[in-house]
């Protein structure tokens, strides 16, 4: 499931580790796959709202793709510090993260061709809008059912074409890219001795079908490096 910024997840989405999901450098073909708002608590990250575009994936894989998007977004937030911006690269996909000092966080999962500057501007705008509409007292215990915020789908659709979204970035100060923490792979988020397989197995976000797809993809990927 490449959209979740993980080699294993890429394999899940394609159905086999040798498949490559094609994409073009044309801006019209750049893609945003998910936009999530989370709260970074003392014991983990809570998904408050999420919007997804999995239309480019096989119909039968879409549920698992979306599950792994959520899993990856939560892990990224949990392993990052408040007040930070970070980008995680895996294959041809990028996860962009911004955690405010008040523990409200946003994650965008995008095609690698999509401009990072636009992604971070989107996160700034979304978190600002969300914080104005949803009282902060509801964040620590909130979830997708209890939080009433309907703006994410519109943001995800509007920003699919970065050229249309780009004029809005002029409202924002230029982002100092030197302050963005870069992670080469999802594995770099793990602590010493920690295994992604174990996190997947213990995850409450992933359903049994998604975990089964992950295991199958891992087995296939162990003997094939074409991704």
Model region roles, listed by residue range:
Residues 2-10, 14-197, 201-227:
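Acidic, low-complexity cytosolic segments
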């Amino acid at each position: 499931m490449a959209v979740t910024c993980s080699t294993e997840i890429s394999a899940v989405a394609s159905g086999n580790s040798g498949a490559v999901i094609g994409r073009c450098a044309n801006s019209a073909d750049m893609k945003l796959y998910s936009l999530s708002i989370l709260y970074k608590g003392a014991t983990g990250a809570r998904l408050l709202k999420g919007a997804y575009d999995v239309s480019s994936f096989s119909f039968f894989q879409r549920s698992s793709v979306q599950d792994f998007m959520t899993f990856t977004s939560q892990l990224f937030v949990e392993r990052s510090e408040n007040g930070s911006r970070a980008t995680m690269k895996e294959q041809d996909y990028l996860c962009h993260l911004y955690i405010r000092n008040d523990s409200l966080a946003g994650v965008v999962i995008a095609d690698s061709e999509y401009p990072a500057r636009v992604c971070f501007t989107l996160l700034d705008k979304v978190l600002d809008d969300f914080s104005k509409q949803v009282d902060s007292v509801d964040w620590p215990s909130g979830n997708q059912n209890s939080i009433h915020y309907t703006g994410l789908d519109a943001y995800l659709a509007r920003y699919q074409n970065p050229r249309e979204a780009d004029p809005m970035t002029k409202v924002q100060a230029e982002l100092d890219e030197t302050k963005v923490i870069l992670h080469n792979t999802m594995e770099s988020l793990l602590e010493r001795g920690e295994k992604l397989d174990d996190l997947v197995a213990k995850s409450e976000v992933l359903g049994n079908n998604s975990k089964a797809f992950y295991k199958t993809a891992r087995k296939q990927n162990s003997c094939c490096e074409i991704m």
